[in-house]
């Protein structure tokens, strides 16, 4: 009897181990199958939805410009610390890195037909005089694209004559530009209408981002190429 009982016990253990083995093998197969399905789905998703970088447009603006237009991006200075930046057709014309900006109104002149840079300059309208700035404005050739950005203060020495000449370039906000306001503008010599490219942030102690200065004002867009004589 003892031998028969031992045999039954051994058979029971063997059946248990066999059952466990079969179940584990089936589970393992299913696991591999599931993992395979996951990898297959992942590969299909990668092919169907490939990762692509967002396109970069000229001057880093948010859209592509139409044909016969120049992309531009312009930013005023930040307080009296960081200078303005002017980019046209993917070329940085003025910036602190280029070391060609300064306190006052910073100006870049661009050929309206080719987009080529004509001149960059700045006029100190806080510690300097307005006379040289007026003479500069008088000599801008017709058909020239004019880009302007303030840094620190661009208004203290502005007089009616200077404001009138900037207004003739297409500005509508130059007459309200005041001490330490931030302002950016794109216009043209000989323009027949007011420019759509102008932004202004007033110096206001209650809303200023920096102590004594408003936040930086930025603007981007597409300037139509001058086609007619």
Swiss-Prot record:
Q: Does the entry feature the keyword Signal, yes or no?
A: yes
Q: Which UniProt keywords apply?
A: Developmental protein, Disulfide bond, Lectin, Secreted, Signal
**Which Pfam families does UniProt cross-reference here?**
ILEI
What is the documented function of this protein?
Answer: Involved in retinal laminar formation.
CC per GO annotation = extracellular space
The primary site where this protein sits is secreted
Its tissue distribution reads:
Expressed in the retinal ganglion cell layer.
Name of the protein in its database record: Protein FAM3C
**GO-annotated molecular function:** carbohydrate binding
Q: Which organism is it from?
A: Xenopus laevis (African clawed frog)
Query: Which PANTHER family does the entry link to?
Result: UNCHARACTERIZED FAM3
What family does the database annotate?
Answer: Belongs to the FAM3 family.
InterPro entries on file: FAM3, ILEI/PANDER_dom, ILEI_FAM3C
- Stretch forming the signal peptide: 1-24
